[in-house]
């Protein structure tokens, strides 16, 4: 297996190639006593290995670039003064320099090469090859991507996309290359390659390939989504949960009554909903065995913890956020008991759930959306950004992230909206906006109440519930749901003085309006303004 020729990538004098290592090999490699610094993994009391990623404990969006060439120029959603995003242009000359730095770093070394699939649908899956010098990074992609069988590996052939992880190399001349810092994550759609320099954070590999799937799939009529998904045990219908980091995608889709398709990245084609990944990447800050048993129990041998505080004897402190609030674990999806087998895909979705963690305490715990509101709130992608998933953010601040994943969109947001709406119209799916954040009590809505709301959406009882309209937003909200505290369903009731809600609601409504202005450059966008908040 290890007779791979890496010289075609410019990587020379390779000492040894460890090709698609087993979990036992990875464990031995990442815990070698001779390892130092961020390469060294620590075995914890739960059997999982913990690693530290240095100053980058989250993605570094300011350091993300696409090479501007004939493959990308007219199709990528480039950042602009009117609408800033993370897709910054990089020159061919800068790319050549960065690629040279990466292959130089990887040359003359003992390397890990992990050949994976991205996408559970064989017809449209991407063959992705990862090349790195650090064992735990090989472990990370082995967890997160779809692991080929021995037969699939034997017939793998050439990859569709190659990611070079040179975390140890720095971009000293970044200013002359037109970059942001000594760190870079750069994509070349022409050569179908990704280069990672000077960041150890595992999520750059995962989300990097997600950006590529988000480029390819909508162009071939497949909805590409930053969401989790599950299905009923009979496999009759799926539900998808959109939401930014920390809004509850992983927690709420991991449901003992249902089968998990996946927790973060999916496609929806004419056959149904399918996972892009072969693993889960869950936040573990304040992880509690009682409230999230599935995730807790997934943390065992072969799982990989990131930036968690672990004592010398292996004892884990999940409450300690001194390194970062964005502590994580990656594990192969089969560490969760209730999953769709053998392939992570399900039927068409009947329920589409938008999760927002509203720090303002304005949004109802659940709203039933019209088709027009569905498009408006999908393009708005509102949440309050929760602490620490990106560098430099620690307080809850309002965030509008198109399609609940603007950081990963490689095409214009309206393209993702179009594809989602097409699929929803085809299957008659309904959308719901669920607030997993705060209300007038100053406390976060309990996970018990949120789970009750999700149950009512999934079993259809929400569609039978009595409802009323909420002002400014014109949301239709149920006034009673089984197993949910009725006093929270109208957010005004959670305030000592409803005038307080009124004031905050007007403020938030104005923020929605201001944000949506950037979508009104065409007729379709203009037509949706009426579905948004009105003052």
Swiss-Prot record:
Its biological purpose: Involved in the gluconeogenesis. Catalyzes the conversion of oxaloacetate (OAA) to phosphoenolpyruvate (PEP) through direct phosphoryl transfer between the nucleoside triphosphate and OAA.
Record-listed ATP binding positions: 207, 226, 243-251, 292, 328, 444-445, 450
Annotated Gene Ontology cellular component terms: cytosol
GO biological process, alphabetically ordered: gluconeogenesis
UniProt keyword ATP-binding present: yes
Protein EC: 4.1.1.49
Binding-site residues, Mn(2+): 207, 226, 264
Annotated substrate binding sites: 59, 201, 207, 328
Pfam families with a match to the protein in the record: PEPCK_ATP
Gene3D superfamilies referenced in this protein's UniProt entry, alphabetically: 3.90.228.20, Phosphoenolpyruvate Carboxykinase, domain 1, Phosphoenolpyruvate Carboxykinase, domain 2
Protein name according to UniProt: Phosphoenolpyruvate carboxykinase (ATP)
Manner of cofactor binding, per the entry note: Binds 1 Mn(2+) ion per subunit.
Keywords: ATP-binding, Cytoplasm, Decarboxylase, Gluconeogenesis, Lyase, Manganese, Metal-binding, Nucleotide-binding
Compartmental location: Cytoplasm
Family statement: Belongs to the phosphoenolpyruvate carboxykinase (ATP) family.
Swiss-Prot/TrEMBL catalytic activity: oxaloacetate + ATP = phosphoenolpyruvate + ADP + CO2
Main location: cytoplasm
Pathway entry: Carbohydrate biosynthesis; gluconeogenesis
Co-factor(s): Mn(2+)
GO molecular function: ATP binding; metal ion binding; phosphoenolpyruvate carboxykinase (ATP) activity
């Amino acid at each position: 297996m290890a007779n791979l020729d890496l010289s075609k990538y410019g990587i020379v004098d390779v000492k040894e190639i460890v090709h698609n290592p087993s979990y036992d090999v990875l464990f031995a490699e990442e815990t070698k006593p001779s390892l130092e610094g961020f390469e060294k993994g620590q075995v914890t009391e739960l059997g999982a290995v913990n690693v530290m990623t240095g100053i980058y404990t989250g993605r570094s969006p300011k350091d993300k670039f696409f090479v501007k060439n004939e493959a990308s120029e007219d199709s990528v959603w480039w950042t602009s003064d009117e609408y800033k995003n993370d897709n910054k242009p990089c020159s061919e000359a800068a790319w050549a320099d960065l690629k040279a730095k990466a292959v130089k770093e990887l040359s003359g070394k003992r390397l890990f090469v992990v050949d994976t699939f991205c996408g559970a649908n064989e017809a449209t899956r991407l063959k992705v090859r990862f090349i790195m010098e650090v064992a735990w990074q090989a472990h990370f992609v082995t967890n997160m991507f779809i692991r080929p069988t021995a037969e699939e590996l034997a017939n793998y052939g050439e990859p569709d996309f190659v990611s070079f992880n040179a975390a140890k190399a720095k971009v000293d001349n970044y200013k002359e290359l037109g970059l942001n810092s000594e760190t870079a994550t750069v994509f070349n759609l022409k050569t179908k390659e990704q280069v990672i320099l000077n960041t150890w954070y595992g999520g750059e590999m995962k989300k990097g390939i997600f950006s590529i799937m988000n480029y390819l799939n909508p162009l071939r009529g497949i909805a590409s989504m930053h969401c989790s998904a599950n299905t009923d045990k009979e496999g009759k219908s799926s539900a998808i949960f959109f939401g930014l980091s920390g809004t509850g995608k992983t927690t709420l889709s991991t449901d003992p009554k249902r089968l998990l398709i996946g927790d973060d990245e999916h496609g929806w084609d004419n056959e149904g909903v399918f996972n892009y990944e072969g693993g889960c990447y869950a936040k573990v800050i304040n992880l509690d065995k009682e409230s999230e048993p599935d995730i807790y129990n997934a943390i065992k041998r072969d799982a990989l913890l990131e930036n968690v505080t672990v004592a010398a004897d292996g004892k884990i402190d999940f409450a300690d956020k001194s390194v970062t609030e964005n502590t994580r674990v990656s594990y192969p999806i089969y560490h969760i008991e209730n999953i769709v087998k053998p392939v992570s895909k399900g039927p068409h979705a009947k329920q589409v759930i938008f999760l927002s963690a509203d720090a303002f305490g304005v949004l109802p715990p659940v709203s039933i959306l019209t088709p027009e509101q569905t498009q408006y709130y999908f393009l708005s992608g509102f949440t309050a950004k929760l602490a620490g998933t990106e560098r430099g953010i620690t307080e809850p601040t309002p965030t509008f992230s198109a399609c609940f994943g603007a950081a990963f969109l490689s095409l214009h947001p309206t393209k993702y909206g179009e594809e989602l709406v097409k699929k929803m119209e085809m299957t008659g799916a309904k959308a719901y906006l669920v607030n997993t954040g705060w209300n007038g009590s100053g406390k976060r809505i309990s996970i018990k109440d949120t789970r009750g709301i999700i149950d009512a959406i999934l079993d259809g009882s929400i569609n039978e519930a009595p409802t009323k309209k909420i002002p400014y937003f014109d949301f239709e909200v149920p006034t009673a749901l089984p197993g949910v505290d009725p006093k929270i369903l109208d957010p005004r009731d959670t305030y000592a003085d409803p005038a307080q809600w009124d004031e905050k609601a007007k403020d938030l409504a104005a923020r929605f309006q201001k944000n949506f202005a950037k979508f009104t450059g065409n007729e379709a966008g203009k037509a949706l303004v009426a579905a948004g908040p009105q003052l």
